[in-house]
Amino acid sequence: MTSASAPPDLKAHGLSPEEYRQIQQQLGRDPNPTELAMFGVMWSEHCCYKNSRPLLKHFPTTGERVVVGPGENAGVVDLGDGDWLAFKIESHNHPSAVEPFQGAATGVGGILRDIFTLGARPIALLNSLRFGPLTDPRNRRLMARVVEGIAHYGNCVGVPTVGGEVAVDPCYSGNPLVNVMALGLLETPAVVKSAARGVGNPILYVGATTGRDGIRGASFASAELKEDAQQDRPAVQVGDPFLGKCLIEACLEAFATVAVVAAQDMGAAGITCSTAEMAAKGGVGIRFDLDRVPARESGMAAWEYLLSESQERMLLVVQKGREAEVMEIFHRWGLQASVAGEVIAEPLVEIWHQGSCVVRVPARALAEDTPVYVRPLLPEPPEYVQAAWQWDPSTLPPCDRQGIHLPQKTLAWEQVLLQLLASPTLASKAWIYRQYDHQVQNNTVLWPGQGDAAVIRIRSQKFGVGEVPPLQAARKAIAATLDGNGRWVYLDPYEGAKAAVAEAARNLSCVGADPLAITDNLNFGSPENPVVYWQLALACRGIAEACRALGTPVTGGNVSLYNEKGSQAIYPTPVIGMVGLIPDLKFICGQGWQQEGDLVYLLGSQAVTSLGGSEYLAAIYNKVTGRPAPVDLELEKRVQGACRHGIRQGWVRSAHDCSEGGLAVALAEACLSGGRGASVSLAPGSLPWDQALFGEGSSRILVSVDPAQRSPWEAYLESQLPGQWQLLGQVGGPADPLVLTTAEGDPLLSVSLAALQGAYYSAFAD
């Protein structure tokens, strides 16, 4: 093993001169080229979170249901009755920008490995997607290929894609966001951890062969996208969902033998990351021989083996003497399996290639003792925020109950509503989710578009061919959702991030679930930009506060920085993945009206709304300005609690979050989902008409209630939400329009279901 003799090209490794000096200090010498390549990927933002780690430590991470928190491959929560749920979110933003099909597909494959590596069988997938305007053919192609990639991997591997969200904004042009969340139920007696243990225990390489695909993928994901980003296509991994399915089954079968001491999937930074993290977490070392790694290409150098991110690969630490037993399982599933290393006492990562030791570095130097940057925080909001907060809604064209009076015409409220429903962010995503298999495994209770959150039956998937456990054995269910609003966070990072957590919990409450915990994906620009770092820091504060208030600890997540191209950064976009528990499947709710004559109520207050950052401002006036409404977390808890109680008492027949698009859009969505009209009167108040109809805010839920239950329902509301609920009207029939009037009965808008459908299903039409 020799040291580098010439000055290294630090830029190629994504390292600064100061970081190189830290490496020299930790090693007591210069790293050789192979070691330097390993440090380059392990010290990248994608792997070590050097800019975000100080901010993440403020998140609440413990709770009575938390079994596994941050630090493992995924978080785990206790659902009771011996059921444990693993869940996690990951991003594949940069790869999807340059190779959308494979970038998105391998994002699905990677998050599934995080789940089953713990010993959990994957039961559901969700995704959160952001694209630039679909009028641009490139953005439309990106979207189509991303959706195709997600559908391909999920459908082939046999895991249903049950929900998610899609937003469209110019800031995501050329820099799409592809965040994927997976859920799984534990099948092993205990969680399979990733810390290597037992000196002398063999290390098994299992799964697919290793090639040159995905080399330096972690470094690629830790830098800004270049204008000529297509040259980075070799950094994008290539997945095989059929092989991935075999890997799921082989791993779960191997874990059931209890011969596996530790497991780690090979994702970002491949063999480098897996060996370093397993050794560092266990306080031991790993000796690894690259000559024993099954390769799909000849002539690969040591650094290529180490940095390859070929998919569907795992490292296992196995009890000594039981390696043959475990390898036989993988061979039977048609997978590679070989003894490629062993656990050693000295806490080093020692890599051998062609009979020589090519790497010998402390495991902690690669995985734990990495750079950390605590950057100064702006003393006050940046200029763009201060300017936005000065915006006055009175500068908009005048409006009355007829509509908006523009210089050349009056835009009726019916036209405004239809224009909003046709905007890609609010429009139906049926064209997208129709491509996903959301029924495979036969546990999806609420399909995409039916409710504010996905609902998945809790039923063991451990059965033989031709054997299916009875449905009546499943009483409980899991609810899951993904939520984020980049515009709100751009205009107010602290309140916008709080609102994302609150909306996720609200969506779970709307289907009848108790919110349990979250996983978060922080999508931001370059932290080296003081404005972006300020956005990131305040968003983390907002998430932490909301999670504490709502009792939803953070069990893990992902940070994706440097989401920018040239001088154009995306909006700061934290995406919250939240899971909840439904104690009894008899008491769940969809978002659509159920019965003609049901009473329509609004829980919460219209006074908590704002036009700042609204879809109304963006779609009608092409403005992104103002200040989003602050989140009253105490009111949020009471509104959600009232909704859940009403569902479990059998009073509430439908429930729908009132957020993006405001009250008028929420009413239209309930009509569309239920196939029925409604007649509604706005409560008396002093709000301008545009804010009353389309203002956005938190802590509001639209529900429909059995009229026979009006008395106990309203008595309960008055005790729990005094003065903060309104009876708006009643549900109509399939032939009735959506009618909104003033409190005095004067007409505001009347739109037929056919017109609503024509607008709502137009944005993503085939």
Curated annotation (Swiss-Prot):
A Pfam family that the UniProt record links to this protein: AIRS
Q: Does the keyword Nucleotide-binding apply?
A: yes
Q: What is its main location?
A: cytoplasm
Can you tell me which residues form the catalytic site? Answer: 46, 92
Q: In which pathway does it act?
A: Purine metabolism; IMP biosynthesis via de novo pathway; 5-amino-1-(5-phospho-D-ribosyl)imidazole from N(2)-formyl-N(1)-(5-phospho-D-ribosyl)glycinamide: step 1/2
Described purpose of this protein according to its UniProt entry: Part of the phosphoribosylformylglycinamidine synthase complex involved in the purines biosynthetic pathway. Catalyzes the ATP-dependent conversion of formylglycinamide ribonucleotide (FGAR) and glutamine to yield formylglycinamidine ribonucleotide (FGAM) and glutamate. The FGAM synthase complex is composed of three subunits. PurQ produces an ammonia molecule by converting glutamine to glutamate. PurL transfers the ammonia molecule to FGAR to form FGAM in an ATP-dependent manner.
InterPro entries per the UniProt record, alphabetical: PRibForGlyAmidine_synth_PurL, PurL_linker, PurM-like_C_dom, PurM-like_C_sf, PurM-like_N, PurM-like_N_sf
Keywords from UniProt, A to Z, are: ATP-binding, Cytoplasm, Ligase, Magnesium, Metal-binding, Nucleotide-binding, Purine biosynthesis
Organism annotation: Synechococcus sp. (strain JA-3-3Ab) (Cyanobacteria bacterium Yellowstone A-Prime)
- Stated EC number for the protein is 6.3.5.3
The Swiss-Prot or TrEMBL record describes its family as follows: Belongs to the FGAMS family.
Record's subcellular location: Cytoplasm
Which residues of this UniProt protein bind Mg(2+) 2?
114, 265
Q: Per UniProt, what is one GO molecular function of this protein?
A: phosphoribosylformylglycinamidine synthase activity
Q: Where does substrate bind?
A: 91-94, 113, 237, 309-311, 560
Q: What is this protein called?
A: Phosphoribosylformylglycinamidine synthase subunit PurL
Which Gene3D superfamilies does the record cross-reference, listed alphabetically?
PurM-like C-terminal domain (3.90.650.10), PurM-like, N-terminal domain (3.30.1330.10)
Which PANTHER family does the record associate with it?
A: PHOSPHORIBOSYLFORMYLGLYCINAMIDINE SYNTHASE SUBUNIT PURL (PTHR43555:SF1)
The UniProt entry's GO biological process terms, in alphabetical order, are: 'de novo' IMP biosynthetic process
Locate the residues binding Mg(2+) 1: 90, 558
SUPFAM superfamilies cross-referenced by the UniProt entry: PurM C-terminal domain-like (SSF56042), PurM N-terminal domain-like (SSF55326)
Reaction catalysis annotation: N(2)-formyl-N(1)-(5-phospho-beta-D-ribosyl)glycinamide + L-glutamine + ATP + H2O = 2-formamido-N(1)-(5-O-phospho-beta-D-ribosyl)acetamidine + L-glutamate + ADP + phosphate + H(+)
